[in-house]
């Protein structure tokens, strides 16, 4: 792919396990880490994953510590999503968040992640007017936000926009299926690509891949439709609520780690209960302060 800055043709030559330094899924040892600095994952490594029938993991990240933790845990792609709107800034949807709000988050993630590919969402209203607007916004995210790639929502209507961005040197991940920025026109959170509508998503994916998108993300799409899309295009696919045939999977980290309360979407698997852990820690701290147990002698000068 033209978006890569690396001349390596082999994924295993550059990137640590599972993409190098030993058999697939083998954990890196301390001696491995000491031998050489960790190399940055590039878009062509994701392509190699699809070509080899391998998979990669993607999580959202919005600030330093989660970026560091997920990067050290081996997550290959970090998404500075417009989901920050309702997971950081307290909005009900992703629509209100702006470019100027996302850029500082993007910088923090890009500075903190030493290995992961950092992808930034272009928020609603920042690319729809014209290809020129999209290129200008994309440049800001690479130049000011330090992102390595951007993501835009929409089907084949945006193929020319993707083409213009790629020609300008901006790697683009396309996002089809349920597109949260279009929730009002789609009638709310609804599965896309059922029945006869499946062909529309296939056509969208083909057009976007041909325009130069390095990957196509599908959200809330039936597993059979997602498999058909994945088979129809050469570039890697990413799924969120799209079955397990995609090359990559993505989740919002607060959902994955159990930080957000309330009912989770069907496609979310919760791997921790951080909300309860943090609540218990805050309660214990408050109790210690109110009863005079903190700070104790060991915390005083």
From Swiss-Prot:
The cofactor named in the record is: Mg(2+)
Q: In which pathway does it act?
A: Cofactor biosynthesis; (R)-pantothenate biosynthesis; (R)-pantoate from 3-methyl-2-oxobutanoate: step 1/2
Localisation: Cytoplasm
Q: Segment Disordered: which positions?
A: 1-37
Q: Which InterPro entries match?
A: Pantoate_hydroxy_MeTrfase, Pyrv/PenolPyrv_kinase-like_dom, Pyrv_kinase-like_dom_sf
Q: List the catalytic activities from the record.
A: 3-methyl-2-oxobutanoate + (6R)-5,10-methylene-5,6,7,8-tetrahydrofolate + H2O = 2-dehydropantoate + (6S)-5,6,7,8-tetrahydrofolate
Q: What is this protein called?
A: 3-methyl-2-oxobutanoate hydroxymethyltransferase
């Amino acid at each position: 792919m033209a978006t890569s800055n690396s001349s390596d043709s082999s994924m295993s030559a550059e990137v640590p396990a599972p993409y190098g330094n030993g058999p697939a899924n083998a954990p890196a040892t301390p001696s491995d880490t000491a031998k050489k600095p960790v190399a940055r994952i590039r878009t062509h490594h994701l392509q190699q994953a699809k070509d080899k029938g391998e998979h990669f993991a993607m999580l959202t990240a919005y600030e330093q510590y989660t970026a560091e933790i997920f990067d050290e845990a081996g997550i290959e792609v970090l998404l500075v999503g417009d989901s920050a709107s309702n997971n950081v800034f307290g909005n009900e949807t992703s629509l209100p968040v702006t470019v100027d709000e996302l850029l500082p988050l993007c910088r923090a993630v890009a500075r903190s992640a030493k290995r992961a590919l950092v992808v930034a969402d272009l928020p609603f209203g920042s690319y729809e007017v014209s290809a020129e607007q999209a290129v200008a916004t994309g440049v800001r995210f690479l130049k000011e936000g330090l992102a390595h790639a951007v993501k835009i929502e929409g089907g084949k209507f945006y193929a020319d926009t993707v083409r213009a961005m790629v020609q300008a040197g901006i790697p683009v991940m396309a996002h089809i299926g349920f597109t949260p920025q279009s929730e009002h026109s789609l009638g709310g959170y609804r599965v896309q690509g059922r029945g006869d509508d499946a062909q529309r998503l296939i056509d969208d994916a083909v057009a976007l891949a041909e325009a130069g998108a390095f990957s196509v993300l599908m959200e809330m799409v039936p597993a059979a439709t997602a498999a058909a899309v994945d088979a129809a295009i050469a570039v890697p696919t990413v799924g969120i609520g799209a079955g397990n045939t995609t090359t990559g999977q993505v989740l919002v980290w607060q959902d994955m780690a159990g930080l957000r309360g309330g009912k989770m979407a069907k496609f979310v698997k919760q791997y921790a209960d951080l909300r309860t852990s943090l609540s218990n820690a805050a309660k214990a701290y408050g109790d210690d302060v109110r009863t005079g147990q903190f700070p104790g002698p060991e915390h005083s000068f």
